[in-house]
């Protein structure tokens, strides 16, 4: 095995502690046997760990710099797993994603109060409900603190005791000696499952969990102007916490149904209306539907097909500022008849003569088409 530990980590001899730590993290991830299956990767991984063990501690690094491998060959003789310090911490950090040396995930102490889990609820709104908002009633199922044991998980009149296996830490640590150094494996305590406490007489109602699944009705406020895909946070309505920890939050994800008449574009509302060719030529005032009800819309004389007319401040309220609203944009469609009565034909032919136009091959219908494309 090469004994130039600086070369193994790819650092210079004057490298600082942080440089050595970064090099170790990078190489350990790359050559860990659970990740790298190439021949020789496991042996190189052992070399990397040995190099970091020597160079990360000032005392052993100094001996190595002065005497080489001979100065550190007995460095593991007085090893104490409880005094691993930074090496254990960095090792747990690096391999927390895919388990420790023994293949088990590293554990973090979780004996204190723990916040409850957040919950998600998908909720559908009609188009106008999203525009104007309002109060809605919902039903959720979440975990609430057991009222029989008050969240302790123990039968009333009894209490839990500190786990003797892990001394209340919720995790156990084991040191493994190898020819290449000594490593620590940290895992969840098998006796208390990481709780740090053992409940000998469990609550009959919640089975020792300290929480019960309950159905609850809530009234939530939908702000005016919400849109499809938005989420609302309802504080403290998620699952109850453990050991006095705060509850999680409820997140309501909104789906807005489409409307047969209106479309939304940002804070503007869009719709179409159809008028007759006479109304388009002469102009008029008509009633149109909006989300607020019917409104008067003035059609200017000579309005062309696909003209967009705007009703200001009749769109969607701006989220957080409902006094300010978008506009309602109305696209005008013009209906040109495919057939006309004899009286209508006579009048239209007179109009064509007044305009100095001849009725061509397209007939009166072609004449009307020409009017709206000039």
Swiss-Prot record:
Gene3D superfamilies hit by this protein: DnaJ domain, Heat shock protein DnaJ, cysteine-rich domain, Urease metallochaperone UreE, N-terminal domain
Q: How is the cofactor bound?
A: Binds 2 Zn(2+) ions per monomer.
Q: Where are the CXXCXGXG motif repeats?
A: 146-153, 163-170, 189-196, 203-210
> Where, if anywhere, are coiled coils annotated?
none
Q: What is this protein called?
A: Chaperone protein DnaJ
Q: Where in the cell is it found?
A: Cytoplasm
Question: A single Pfam family, by name?
Answer: DnaJ_C
Name the InterPro entries for this protein: DnaJ, DnaJ_C, DnaJ_domain, HSP40/DnaJ_pept-bd, HSP_DnaJ_Cys-rich_dom, HSP_DnaJ_Cys-rich_dom_sf, J_dom_sf
Quote the PROSITE patterns the UniProt record gives.
DNAJ_2, ZF_CR
Q: Which GO cellular component terms, listed alphabetically, does the Swiss-Prot or TrEMBL entry include?
A: cytoplasm
What is a single molecular function from GO for this protein? Answer: unfolded protein binding
Which sites bind Zn(2+) 2? 163, 166, 189, 192
Q: Which family does it belong to?
A: Belongs to the DnaJ family.
Q: Where does the chain bind Zn(2+) 1?
A: 146, 149, 203, 206
Per the record, the domain comment is: The J domain is necessary and sufficient to stimulate DnaK ATPase activity. Zinc center 1 plays an important role in the autonomous, DnaK-independent chaperone activity of DnaJ. Zinc center 2 is essential for interaction with DnaK and for DnaJ activity.
Look up keyword Chaperone and say if it applies: yes
Give start and end of each J domain: 4-68
What does the record give as cofactor? Zn(2+)
Could you tell me which species this protein originates from?
Answer: Microcystis aeruginosa (strain NIES-843 / IAM M-2473)
Q: What does this protein do?
A: Participates actively in the response to hyperosmotic and heat shock by preventing the aggregation of stress-denatured proteins and by disaggregating proteins, also in an autonomous, DnaK-independent fashion. Unfolded proteins bind initially to DnaJ; upon interaction with the DnaJ-bound protein, DnaK hydrolyzes its bound ATP, resulting in the formation of a stable complex. GrpE releases ADP from DnaK; ATP binding to DnaK triggers the release of the substrate protein, thus completing the reaction cycle.
Major location category of this protein: cytoplasm
Keywords (A to Z) from UniProt:
Chaperone, Cytoplasm, DNA replication, Metal-binding, Repeat, Stress response, Zinc, Zinc-finger
**Which segments does the record annotate as CR-type zinc fingers?**
133-215
Q: Quaternary structure per UniProt?
A: Homodimer.
Offer one example of a GO biological process linked to this entry.
Answer: protein refolding
């Amino acid at each position: 095995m090469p004994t130039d530990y600086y070369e193994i980590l790819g650092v210079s001899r004057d490298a600082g502690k942080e440089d050595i730590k970064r090099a170790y993290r990078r190489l350990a991830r790359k050559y860990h046997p659970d990740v790298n299956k190439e021949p020789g990767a496991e042996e190189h991984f052992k070399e990397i760990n040995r190099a970091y063990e020597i160079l990360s501690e000032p005392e052993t690094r100094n001996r190595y710099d002065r005497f080489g491998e001979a100065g550190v060959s007995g460095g593991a003789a007085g090893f104490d797993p409880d005094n691993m310090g930074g090496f254990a911490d960095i090792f747990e950090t690096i391999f927390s994603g895919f388990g420790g040396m023994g293949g088990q995930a590293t554990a973090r102490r979780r004996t204190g109060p723990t916040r409850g889990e957040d919950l998600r609820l998908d909720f559908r709104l009609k188009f106008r409900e999203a525009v104007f908002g309002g109060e809605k009633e919902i039903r959720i199922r979440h975990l609430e603190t057991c009222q029989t044991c008050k969240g302790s998980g123990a039968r009333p009149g009894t209490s839990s005791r500190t786990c003797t296996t892990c001394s209340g830490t919720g995790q156990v640590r084991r040191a493994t000696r190898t020819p290449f150094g000594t490593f620590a494996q940290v895992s969840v305590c098998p006796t208390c499952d990481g709780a740090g406490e053992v409940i000998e007489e469990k609550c009959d109602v919640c089975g020792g969990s300290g929480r019960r699944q309950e159905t609850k009705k809530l009234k939530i406020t939908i702000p005016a102007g919400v849109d499809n895909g938005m989420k609302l946070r309802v504080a403290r309505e998620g699952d109850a916490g453990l050991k006095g920890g705060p509850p999680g939050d409820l997140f309501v994800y909104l789906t807005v149904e489409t409307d047969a008449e209106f479309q939304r574009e940002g804070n503007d509302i869009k719709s179409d209306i159809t008028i007759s060719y006479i109304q388009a030529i002469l102009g008029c005032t008509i009633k149109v539907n909006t989300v607020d009800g019917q409104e008067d819309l003035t059609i200017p004389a000579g309005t062309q097909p696909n003209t967009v007319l705007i009703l200001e401040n009749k769109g969607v309220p701006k989220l957080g500022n409902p006094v300010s609203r978008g506009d309602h944009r109305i696209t005008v469609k013009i209906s040109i008849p495919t057939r006309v009565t004899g009286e209508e034909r006579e009048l239209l032919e007179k109009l064509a003569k007044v305009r100095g136009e001849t009725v061509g091959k397209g007939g009166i219908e072609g004449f009307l088409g020409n009017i709206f494309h000039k």
